[in-house]
From Swiss-Prot:
Residues 656-831 form the Integrase catalytic domain. It comes from Saccharomyces cerevisiae (strain ATCC 204508 / S288c). The gene is TY2B-LR1. Its EC number is 3.4.23.-, 2.7.7.49, 2.7.7.7, 3.1.26.4. Retrotransposons are mobile genetic entities that are able to replicate via an RNA intermediate and a reverse transcription step. In contrast to retroviruses, retrotransposons are non-infectious, lack an envelope and remain intracellular. Ty2 retrotransposons belong to the copia elements (pseudoviridae). The lineage of its organism: Eukaryota, Fungi, Dikarya, Ascomycota, Saccharomycotina. Residues 369-381 have a biased composition (Low complexity). Its main location: cytoplasm. This is Transposon Ty2-LR1 Gag-Pol polyprotein. InterPro entries: DNA/RNA_pol_sf, Integrase_cat-core, PolX-like_BBD, Retrotran_Ty1/copia-like, RNaseH-like_sf, RNaseH_sf, RVT_2, TYA.
Amino acid sequence: MESQQLHQNPHSLHGSAYASVTSKEVPSNQDPLAVSASNLPEFDRDSTKVNSQQETTPGTSAVPENHHHVSPQPASVPPPQNGQYQQHGMMTPNKAMASNWAHYQQPSMMTCSHYQTSPAYYQPDPHYPLPQYIPPLSTSSPDPIDLKNQHSEIPQAKTKVGNNVLPPHTLTSEENFSTWVKFYIRFLKNSNLGDIIPNDQGEIKRQMTYEEHAYIYNTFQAFAPFHLLPTWVKQILEINYADILTVLCKSVSKMQTNNQELKDWIALANLEYDGSTSADTFEITVSTIIQRLKENNINVSDRLACQLILKGLSGDFKYLRNQYRTKTNMKLSQLFAEIQLIYDENKIMNLNKPSQYKQHSEYKNVSRTSPNTTNTKVTTRNYHRTNSSKPRAAKAHNIATSSKFSRVNNDHINESTVSSQYLSDDNELSLGQQQKESKPTHTIDSNDELPDHLLIDSGASQTLVRSAHYLHHATPNSEINIVDAQKQDIPINAIGNLHFNFQNGTKTSIKALHTPNIAYDLLSLSELANQNITACFTRNTLERSDGTVLAPIVKHGDFYWLSKKYLIPSHISKLTINNVNKSKSVNKYPYPLIHRMLGHANFRSIQKSLKKNAVTYLKESDIEWSNASTYQCPDCLIGKSTKHRHVKGSRLKYQESYEPFQYLHTDIFGPVHHLPKSAPSYFISFTDEKTRFQWVYPLHDRREESILNVFTSILAFIKNQFNARVLVIQMDRGSEYTNKTLHKFFTNRGITACYTTTADSRAHGVAERLNRTLLNDCRTLLHCSGLPNHLWFSAVEFSTIIRNSLVSPKNDKSARQHAGLAGLDITTILPFGQPVIVNNHNPDSKIHPRGIPGYALHPSRNSYGYIIYLPSLKKTVDTTNYVILQDNQSKLDQFNYDTLTFDDDLNRLTAHNQSFIEQNETEQSYDQNTESDHDYQSEIEINSDPLVNDFSSQSMNPLQLDHEPVQKVRAPKEVDADISEYNILPSPVRSRTPHIINKESTEMGGTIESDTTSPRHSSTFTARNQKRPGSPNDMIDLTSQDRVNYGLENIKTTRLGGTEEPYIQRNSDTNIKYRTTNSTPSIDDRSSNSESTTPIISIETKAVCDNTPSIDTDPPEYRSSDHATPNIMPDKSSKNVTADSILDDLPLPDLTHKSPTDTSDVSKDIPHIHSRQTNSSLGGMDDSNVLTTTKSKKRSLEDNETEIEVSRDTWNNKNMRSLEPPRSKKRINLIAAIKGVKSIKPVRTTLRYDEAITYNKDNKEKDRYVEAYHKEISQLLKMNTWDTNKYYDRNDIDPKKVINSMFIFNKKRDGTHKARFVARGDIQHPDTYDSDMQSNTVHHYALMTSLSIALDNDYYITQLDISSAYLYADIKEELYIRPPPHLGLNDKLLRLRKSLYGLKQSGANWYETIKSYLINCCDMQEVRGWSCVFKNSQVTICLFVDDMILFSKDLNANKKIITTLKKQYDTKIINLGERDNEIQYDILGLEIKYQRSKYMKLGMEKSLTEKLPKLNVPLNPKGKKLRAPGQPGHYIDQDELEIDEDEYKEKVHEMQKLIGLASYVGYKFRFDLLYYINTLAQHILFPSRQVLDMTYELIQFMWDTRDKQLIWHKNKPTKPDNKLVAISDASYGNQPYYKSQIGNIFLLNGKVIGGKSTKASLTCTSTTEAEIHAVSEAIPLLNNLSHLVQELNKKPIIKGLLTDSRSTISIIKSTNEEKFRNRFFGTKAMRLRDEVSGNNLYVYYIETKKNIADVMTKPLPIKTFKLLTNKWIH
């Protein structure tokens, strides 16, 4: 493109600008970039040489090679005029593209108007608008080619030649940007732009104009091509393409940071200390330097630091050099303590000894002023404009300036003076040091002083005058002290102002101090700068910032002076000034010093202590007490800060102007724990500020949507009912109020959200007090009425109604009256919990009662009715049809409604009793409606209470019962919240079994038994319901004629499975009949189906048919426990497989068999019933919960339930029993913490770098870790883990791709020390790995299966290890890591090439790598469905990361695989396994002893012996050993845990550590502990004392049995098949919320290879359902193991499943496809049928006493636990 022409502006002048640049130089601070070439790094010096300017003489010149520069012009060409650039300074487009700045899609050059600079910046060539060096006129431009060779000979670049300015060289590479920017900043400073360049703090002295901005942008663009800029610069410019100043600011900051390390070393090497400053300050300074070096990975040892400090000690501290000279182990803390001791001794010695005032010749250039009241240091500053290049004005030697602004030599950075400044405290005086007036002395010849003039000092912070003649408004000094370099005070007599009257009538005033103790009067440029007055030393004038000359200044000697003629004299009396009470501060210590010395004690405490002589060597009169009472210590304000007390009534002034319902207070209460899901857990309250009217709304959660719905309702209610608009809502700062949703809601409606201030909860007192009042009322009402806790919100609702109607003590009206509502009609209110009878207008039958007992709660909000709670229906209804029971002595008191037992006929009669509610009686909706607070009470299910004995309190035998038992008043009970709505009906039969404790004790402390039998309904069922055949709601018809005969007869009853059992003939006088159950569960064995029988007392009844379809249409006769019930299999091979063949060789206990009909001792077979209601326990829920489970239409009686039939004529007397207030009972609820347990958090067993090496005090261990560290580094380099040929700048890489790295150290079990360099994959960005890739390892079941097959087939077992396995896998992604710490490259990054340990993708990469190698090079195939299990015709391999286990019949086959692996990987043989005697292995934590052809023992004795003592558990190694891990009957208390937060975290961490180790051991081989581990793991977040004690007991048992082993013996060679068996068991409802515990044990050829204990995911409603759930969990794993066994061993396989539930077996083999009880149960049952029939699975019955899976589902007595486990683990 055609080049642009430069227009000359004939009207613009440049003379003034030229004069300013050439003759006026700014006295500026030291340039942080002005570092000599000798101090530059190598690449800086190289770049300096390349871009240097050859020195010139008047006859020669040189111009650097630069395509932007043009040849210099002949001397005849005059300097160009300052005209505008063509097109306002626009660069030609081709030049812009050459610099690649078109990237910003902005104009290449900024348009700018005329910017005046020196004519030396303009060149005659009109084609180039940027400055270039102008050589002398007599020379010509050298050849650029020749210049290229001359650059290397130039030692350092020149910035100026004569009056010409050299532009910066062009940026040549990204790495040289830091060097280039130094020259560019210097170029701008020489271009009169130094005062707009930011310093290292980002500060500028003035704002630049647009022309200057354009000039900076254009020059930067011209000399810095865009493609050569660093990434961080590009990022700044991409945001704002013209923001060059930000780039310069960050550049300066980076250079300062890089130089900090050098400065710290210099400061440390030049430390000096003579006691002139406090020892504490000196220690802080040195420690700060050392800490800063440490942060830069430079560790300064104590020995080196002590040597540097000792070198700088002088005075009384010098002798410490000799003391520490011979010491080898010097501690820095000890040295500081010695220095502090000497410093304190010197203070005491100088207590009454005045120090000599030093001569002025000893003064250094340090001057500060410190007001006593604020203890604030005032250091001198230089505020005048930096627009001159000549040296600044000289400084007075007796008042020196801060060395921060002194010029430092470029070749040497001396920090000693800087360090000495910061080591001192300006206000600090040694004890005994006196301030006295010194005589004026002169450090210069008196002839140098210019009479009647003020010395202009650029370093003084204050103006000082010796005469008070010019001091205006003088006041005696009592605050300011002037301290010299030796910390000696210069007394100040007075403080005042100097008034100046300059030329042109300009007047100004500055602050001045009067003292006669100085050599001459000092005028501070800092004070002048505050008045916008600067000194121009080139023109020798004082000027305003706009250039107005105020007065000339005179140079005399080395100093500049201002005449005193410009001062306006004062008429103050000299006597007033000179008679200042100097004794006021002389010999007195400043109060701030004493305050600090006495530990920042209170003013009154210090003063009183001195009066009482509690502090010696110091008197009260020795301290300056002026302003002491008002002194504010900054450290005290920070350290002793307290919050202000709430100002009572502070909010009232903001609320007086509001009308009723315009200002609301709101707050949320909750949660309330242990409630049914249908009951609310929170409530939100509202209070009107003006009327104090209150509203409450129930909440189930605190979600944004729920809160928003309530606010919408309350605002609409107030608007419609009171015709008012809410303007302000006051609330706290909870997240439910501060969320964006609610904030937007308020904004859209113009409502002001008023939040409480931080830590001022009392400002929210209206809402807080309301909640407290409502809760107090709620607790009182519930306690008084005895209603269950789930009705708590009804109590709150009732309280709100009453509180709105009553007059508070502070008001003269009630809230209703203030709101304009009528008063409360007392006739519409009933006492909370008042017993009532609700009329039933539509019963199912005419003989059904017309009244239902209930309890009045509160008036209805939606009708004129009342909210009534009906315990029998577990519902609340809104009705007016009720009758109040007023006579407490009515005949109803003799009945107990809750303990009634209904027969099946009456159960059918009440089947539809919900339909009795007429139109005026609204059944409560299931949905939560904020307009109807009582709605939440719908479908409240109640939990059953423990039974109360209705019989005589005296001991009775089962056959002697009272005819008219004394019955107790019972309240409504609570049932499981998960039971369907049909279960809320009264149960047809209630269990009424007395409890007798058997005095015979067991090993666990006794067995609790009932003294009555557990009768079942006989097989005589009614046919009354024939009109609905097949209905599951069939009931037993018992009429009033079904009387009990006194005669006895033998009859038979049909069991659930079809087994007929005889009734045992007994004499009895009772009218109650008993029947036989098919199980007699122990207190913790409810899931078992024991074969013991119960005697039956026969009753003469009417036999009728049963229409209920039987599960087993043709059940077998009862067999003894030795026989099993086989499953009918479709496979022909079932003929050869019998129960005996399945049970053979299994490690089952040996039992003494009893006849199933033996009834010699009836009482021993009575089911055990616990008399105490309990919560969730380690052993599960108490049997009483099962026994009281109600029978409903959808829930049949379970096998282990005991029931008593009651004659029909007693029903009408007992059905009204529950009219007395019910008792509140504790529900069986799981603690909220159990729900939060997701998994066991692994405990860190490794050490960090600082723990293993830096701070490791064990030198031997440290040396081993150091050796391991270097070994790991060598391995990483050997594997080419990263690029070693290039380091990347940290700022140039996308942070997402940067992975943090660290070293971890650990000690292996064999004693070796291991170091591992790992990546922090836990904080790896998701974009840097493929989340679909999986890291696979061998399943533990697969390993156990392989070991079992190896034992049975005499396989050789070889153990291998591949060193640094992950590093063999390449990494595909672009990732960077920080280098190891020994390299010291903190700001550099390394490009990863290998899969470093810790990365998310490393495991998957290694798996794919080794899998490919094994398949392609070793001819292996991976077993389908079992990853990391590989096999060929001879060898099986189990792979666990870098560990390999090889199994083969031929050892040479293993060796062949090893040879192939060594070709590619560094493979170590841990154990070849070639010996024939016993071989010991350590495989994946298991300690294995293997004797081929004989046995295999698996244990962890060594590991547990080492790890368990380190858990901080109080082990009892010498005491009596525990014989079981837990005891049945121990229940975990569910009361809320109140604990400190720190203690809670500590205990949770302890639980994680203990359960983590126990879980590891349990799933490895201690399957007998899995139940206890699983139960305690659910309580990790509930670390109560009881839970911890149970955990300690488990750990103690592990310690006592640490030598136990899982014992395997070789299978008999006569066995042609592999036999795989799963034994299943379930414990019904023994977990929180009626969950069941299920367990399975898997055996291969009689060897236990795995076990599992877990809580059922679904809530089972019967024992059979729980057993089916357990079986359904076992079958899939059983099938997968079957496939694995067939792949590893080609023998035929027999699969068996054993369970102790006959009903489960019947359902599995049944072909009946009628509808099941619920879809979950039915789905599982149908699936089991398909899996059993389709997988040749044999299902057999196993006696409960032989079921070894029983240990997986419940705690057992010691005897039973041993019996079930001693065959397979001992």
